[in-house]
């Protein structure tokens, strides 16, 4: 029987989760793909390709590390709080979620050469719901299908950026990618003579991730310049294995079938291009485009032929983002003059196919502030805070509206400064 995507009720256990998501859409593929931007560019819709800040970390384009300020050590940590409204027909439900998201650091090693390291989320899985249906029209026997899952993937990276010639920078990240997921589907019947069937999907992922990037800055005049940026992420098979365990229980018997596939999951080749316009130190505007070739990736799935590795669950993913910021005067004595005001938006097509239909598209809008942290020993650190609205929607499926508060703190320390003793 074709699996119904409709839910009757999300369980109370979803009310406050730590997995980074509580979306039923995360039961497919690698789950919901994470927003990998950090605090400052997340408030600008996630634009990153042309951004090269001396006091913020932009790991999405490693070429930007070459612009890290000398004598500076940057440390950035972020978290998010969100509430999601799920709507299907006349049924509505709110669910809360919080998540520690990323930690990164960056510093200059030599003139025109910087490095960065950190841990960044790639995908998240977290859901728990059930459906109830009649076995057939007019039947008194009904069955309940319970769906629940958890997991996700992360990458721990180290990268370097170098400016070999004036205005041109290159960089690379290499990282250890790891994660796991557990997805369970259990059918139970009101007729005690009917079999209870449980399917338990699991996977362990251990692999690598590799990205390269470049940036070139055109000096238009003394007040304006434009930076073009581009990155490429290598697509490849992931190490580890995926397993399906099917257990059928009746009053008198229990049968178990286990199927395992090695290297059954892959990640896509990804290409990003973008530009950023800088006007003095007051205005930054940027726009990015990203293509992820998920249609070439494989994933284990239960089909009419059994549990097999297929490429039918995915399609190419496209994302467009734009945003910017304004700061009146970064050197002013007045605090409000040094506050960064940011805004941005993005549109993303789905990488998933659900029962042969396109998964949910996402539209998102964000506003935020960069608040300087000033005290007697440090006036360079910054609190990056933003409010984000996002909608995931697909025809005939659940609509999700999410309101998210993103919080990031960038600590900016002058670790390598030589102090004079009088």
What do these predicted ranges mean?
Residues 18-422:
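Subset of outer-membrane beta-barrel
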């Amino acid at each position: 029987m074709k699996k119904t995507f409709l839910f009757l009720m999300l369980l109370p256990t979803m009310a406050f989760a730590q997995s980074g998501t509580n979306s039923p859409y995360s039961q497919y593929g690698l789950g919901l793909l994470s927003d990998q931007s950090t605090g400052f560019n997340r408030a600008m819709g996630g634009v990153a390709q042309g951004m090269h800040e001396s006091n913020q970390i932009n790991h999405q384009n490693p070429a930007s590390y070459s612009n890290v300020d000398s004598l500076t050590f940057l440390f950035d940590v972020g978290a998010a709080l969100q509430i999601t409204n799920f709507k299907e027909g006349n049924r509505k439900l709110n669910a809360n979620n919080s998540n520690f998201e990323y930690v990164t650091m960056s510093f200059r090693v030599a003139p025109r050469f910087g490095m960065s390291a950190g841990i960044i989320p790639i995908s998240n899985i977290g859901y728990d719901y059930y459906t109830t249906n009649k076995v057939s029209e007019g039947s008194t026997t009904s069955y309940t299908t319970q769906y629940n899952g958890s997991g996700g993937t992360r990458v721990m990276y180290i990268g370097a950026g170098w400016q070999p010639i004036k205005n041109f920078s290159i960089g690379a990240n290499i990282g250890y990618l790891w994660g796991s997921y557990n997805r369970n589907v259990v059918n139970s019947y009101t007729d005690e003579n009917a079999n209870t069937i449980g399917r338990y999907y699991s996977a362990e992922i251990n692999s690598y991730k590799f990205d390269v990037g470049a940036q070139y800055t055109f000096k238009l005049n003394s007040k304006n310049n434009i930076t073009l940026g581009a990155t490429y992420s290598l697509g490849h098979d992931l190490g580890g294995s995926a397993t399906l365990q099917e257990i059928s229980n009746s009053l008198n018997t229990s049968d178990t079938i286990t199927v395992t596939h090695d290297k059954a999951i892959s990640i896509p080749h990804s290409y990003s291009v973008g530009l950023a316009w800088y006007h003095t130190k007051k205005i930054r505007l940027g726009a990015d485009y990203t293509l992820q070739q998920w249609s070439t990736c494989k994933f284990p799935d239960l089909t009419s032929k059994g549990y097999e590795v297929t490429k039918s669950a995915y399609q190419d993913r496209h994302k467009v983002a734009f945003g910017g910021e304004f700061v009146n005067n970064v050197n002013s004595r007045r605090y409000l003059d040094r506050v960064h005001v940011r805004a941005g938006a993005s549109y993303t097509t789905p990488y998933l196919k659900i029962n042969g239909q396109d998964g949910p598209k996402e539209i998102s809008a964000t506003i935020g502030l960069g608040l300087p942290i000033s005290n007697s020993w440090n006036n360079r650190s910054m609190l990056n805070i933003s409010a984000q609205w996002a909608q995931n929607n697909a025809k005939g499926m659940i609509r999700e509206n999410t309101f998210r508060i993103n919080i990031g703190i960038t600590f900016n320390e002058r670790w390598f400064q030589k102090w004079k003793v009088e």
